[in-house]
Amino acid sequence: MSQLKTRFERDGYVIVPGFLSPETLTGLRRITATVLDGLDAAHREKFKATGSLCNFGDHPEFAEIVAHPDVLPLLQGLGYDDIRWLAGYLISKPGKAPPLFWHQDWWGWSEEISYRAAPMGIGLMYYLSDTRPENGCLRVIPGSHRRWHPLHDLPDAHGDALSRAEDLQSRAFASHPDEVAVEVTAGDLVIMDSRLLHSAYANTSGAERSLLTLWYLPEFTDLPDGIRNQLHQIFARTDLDIDADKTAPPSPADWPAAARQQVTDLFPTPADHPTERIFQRHPDQARMLKT
């Protein structure tokens, strides 16, 4: 486990081979197929670069993978405790789909804590099929969770134009000499620091490539109040632009009791008092490690 921790802290990601049992993998494939069958063309078009982005808040059937009994021991073995769960997504790239844009998934770069060694968010990426560059495997810039890289200068990677893959000539979609392809076998787990620059190759095969990405929050109560409050809003899905006459979409707190009770202990809670909104997706080069 110490070698796993060393590689994770150095590179910002690590692979745990064969994490899912064959039975669990089969069950997740069945659930995933049902969810994907229910997607309409508008969803696929809106998330063309990712393929799909199905929030677990809408799908209590994923409760068991959130509460997988080996997850907390794994994260604790890496040296992390006081763990909460933030969100989960079914991300599935259909055959003949474009690449995913380069991005990182942290937004608290205005805060000094974002430049520490330990992550604020840890992504657990469960792959439901074998992956390689030809079918859209993950690609990463090792070490970019703590070191400045030219790709940090890209525009905000979570806008509509990139999500819809409107300009595939943009360097946000291009290969980079520093990239590493992360090829896995179905059932493997990729652990990733939320600050790591990553994307995915185009899926040039004819088959769907699916994964489940779950975000966990280590040392949660040690986080600054502003970050805690923002994380709680993301969990509750109240951080979205919602019309005044509409309510927020469902969150795991709204799941049926049988599903909710499996994960309640992992729910993030807000700080004791309100704070100003923290949201800065671009790191400060001067505060990152020098290469």
Model feature map: region roles:
Residues 1-11, 16-116, 227:
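Non-heme Fe(II)-dependent double-stranded beta-helix
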Residues 18-20, 128-132, 143-145, 219-220:
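Short loop segments at secondary-structure junctions
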Residues 38, 196-291:
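Non-heme Fe(II)/2-oxoglutarate
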Residues 48, 103-108, 112, 164-175, ...:
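Short, surface-exposed loop/helix-turn segments at secondary-structure junctions
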Residues 93, 141-148, 215-221:
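Short edge-strand/loop segments of extracellular domains
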Residues 98-104, 111-113, 134-140, 149-153, ...:
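A short secondary-structure junction signal
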Residues 112-133, 183-186, 191, 215-218:
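Short, conserved beta-strand element in jelly-roll/cupin
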Residues 131-197:
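Double-stranded beta-helix
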